[in-house]
Design a protein with these regions (language model features):
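Proline/glycine-rich low-complexity loops and linkers
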Residues: 88, 95, 143-176, 273-345, ...
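An N-terminal, well-structured beta->alpha segment
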Residues: 1-80, 106-107, 163-196
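Gly/Ser/Thr-rich active-site loops/lids in small-molecule metabolic enzymes
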Residues: 134, 222-224, 276-295, 362-370
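Phosphate-binding and adjacent anionic-ligand microenvironments
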Residues: 256-257, 297-463, 467-484
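Short beta-strand-to-turn element immediately C-terminal to the catalytic PLP-Schiff-base lysine
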Residues: 125-128, 269-273, 353-354
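N-terminal small/polar loop signature for handling phosphorylated ligands or for N-terminal nucleophile
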Residues: 44, 52-120, 211-271
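Gly/Ser/Thr-enriched, mixed-charge loops and adjacent short helices
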Residues: 2-12, 121-253
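Buried hydrophobic positions in well-ordered alpha/beta secondary-structure cores of metabolic enzymes
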Residues: 20, 58, 96, 109, ...
Length: 484
């Protein structure tokens, strides 16, 4: 069996780290053996770097078999003589990152497929400081894991590892919650007496967000809070479609807002007081303006190339810079550190703020948004209306298209090698192939065409002054490449 495995994996590796870690279908690619191959490859890396004396934090989400995958990973690391801090309950990914940073660990792991469909699970790897592992780490890690056979994996009985002190449970949730409470104006939130509806989307944010908001004396109602490994039949990703139940609850209860997080709580979704879904782009703009205007912070902003250029307008108005990076939050956090940026984020719902962790955190972002509403004394809808009055409006559309591997190869060659692009019928300022293909038009509109790093999809984003103009750009791309 071992020789067959080695032959198979040499021809067709089953582990691939993309922009959001490694994700695969449970029992197809995401198996006990493959997970333990990643753990063994990580253990070998830790030992070769001479940091085996530092513990590794492992956490997990609410998905099917996530606790078991976490224990199986811990077994391998412990068998290699590495101490594992296993978080004692399903935990938000940002809490796992925070724990890696707080305990001074060299590495950490999260068993999660984030916002992917329920049939998936995955692994995210973190490095010192609680940062997403960069491609210089994940590529050698995946290559090493794919080269391993079953007999190359070291194992130890869990009872033996625990008795030897190699595996211990970690109860860091209270510390993480306290760190967020210490970073916001709890007194202002208490005085506002806000009614908030939470939607953890059957994920891991319930305990943290409930505790934070109830400590700040918010009136909190929660839906979709139990564990459901099928996520209620929905994609655990906040969007206008998946948050309709939350919107209904906000309107029915007369709440100030609804807050949702994705499956592992690193992404945020918000419903305003009118029941409208606030796009992550709008949340980023709101918080950047709030940090600059209300909190008196100074500094640039970082966004990925598929995120609104409204951030550029806010930055220019305050004499600041807006830096553009490829998709993948590790690029955002790296550029933030390089330029001492005060906020960074992406249109898919992830953001972080200077002084917190170097990764996206839906729990922290949601709490900061509550502070903003409390201190400004206005509804979210009114606050964003003020933004539009000041900076104008940009509309963004995102569409996804499936493909066969043959069709993907054709599109890669046509777009990225031959640079064969539609005419578009408007002035093109320049084209970038930094990550996929981005066309910048002279009127400040743009379009991005790129393959997802986490799902088998081709994504097309367009932003323009009006929805109709953005849709027109999308339609030209779809027609030219025959995507529909």
């Amino acid at each position: 069996m071992t020789e067959e495995l080695k032959t198979y994996t040499a021809q067709e590796p089953q582990i691939h780290f993309g922009t959001g870690g490694w994700r695969a279908i449970i029992s197809e690619g995401f198996t006990q053996l493959n997970v333990q191959r990643v753990a063994q490859a990580l253990a070998a890396r830790i030992i070769s770097q001479g940091v085996a004396d530092k513990p590794v934090v492992i956490g997990y989400d609410q998905r099917f078999l996530s606790p078991e995958f976490a224990w199986w990973s811990a077994q391998v690391l412990a068998a290699n003589g590495i101490h594992v801090h296993l978080i004692d309950r399903p935990a938000p990914t940002p809490m796992i990152m925070w724990t890696v940073k707080d305990l001074g660990c060299a590495y950490g792991m999260a068993i999660t497929a984030s916002h992917n469909p329920a049939i998936y699970n995955g692994i995210k790897v973190f490095t010192a400081g609680g940062r997403d592992a960069e491609v210089e780490i994940t590529t050698p890690l995946q290559d090493a894991a794919n080269a391993l056979g079953a007999d190359d994996i070291k194992l130890i009985e869990l009872s033996q590892a625990q008795a030897a002190g190699l595996i211990s449970t970690q109860t860091s949730m209270n510390w993480y919650i306290d760190s967020i409470l210490d970073s916001v104006d709890v007194k202002a939130i208490r005085h506002a007496h806000l009614k908030i509806v939470l939607d953890p989307m059957f994920g891991v944010s319930r305990t943290c967000l409930q505790t934070i908001l109830m400590t700040a004396r918010c009136d909190v109602e929660t839906i979709h809070e139990r564990r459901d490994t099928l996520f209620g039949g929905r994609l655990p990703s906040p969007s206008s479609k998946t948050l309709q139940a939350l919107a209904n609850e906000v309107l029915e209860r007369g709440a100030a807002m609804g807050i949702a997080t994705d499956g592992d709580a690193d992404r945020l979704g918000v419903i305003d007081n009118t029941g409208k879904f606030l796009h992550p782009n709008e949340i980023l703009v709101l918080l950047y303006e709030y940090l600059l205007e209300e909190k008196g912070w100074h500094g640039p902003v970082v966004r990925n190339l598929a995120t609104t250029h409204m951030l550029d307008r806010v930055a220019r108005a305050h004499g600041e810079q807006c830096y553009e990076v490829p998709v993948g939050f590790k690029w955002v956090s790296s550029k933030m550190a390089e330029h001492d940026a005060i906020i960074g984020g992406e249109s898919s719902g992830g953001l972080t703020v200077k002084g917190h962790i170097a990764g996206k955190d839906g729990v922290y972002a949601g709490t900061l948004l509550v502070e903003m509403v409390a201190k400004k004394g206005k509804h979210l809808s009114e606050i964003y209306a003020d933004i539009v009055a000041k900076y104008g409006q940009l509309e963004m559309i995102e569409t996804d298209y499936g493909f066969t591997m043959e069709r993907k190869a054709q599109l890669l060659e046509q777009i990225y090698e031959r640079h064969d692009l539609p005419e578009f019928g408007q002035v093109v300022d320049h084209v970038s192939y930094l990550d996929g293909c981005k066309v910048y038009f002279a009127d400040d509109s743009w379009v991005v065409i790129r393959f997802s790093g986490t799902e088998p999809l081709l994504r097309v984003f367009a932003e323009a002054a009006t929805y109709e103009q953005a849709q027109g750009i999308i339609d030209q791309v779809v027609a030219y490449y025959q995507l529909a």
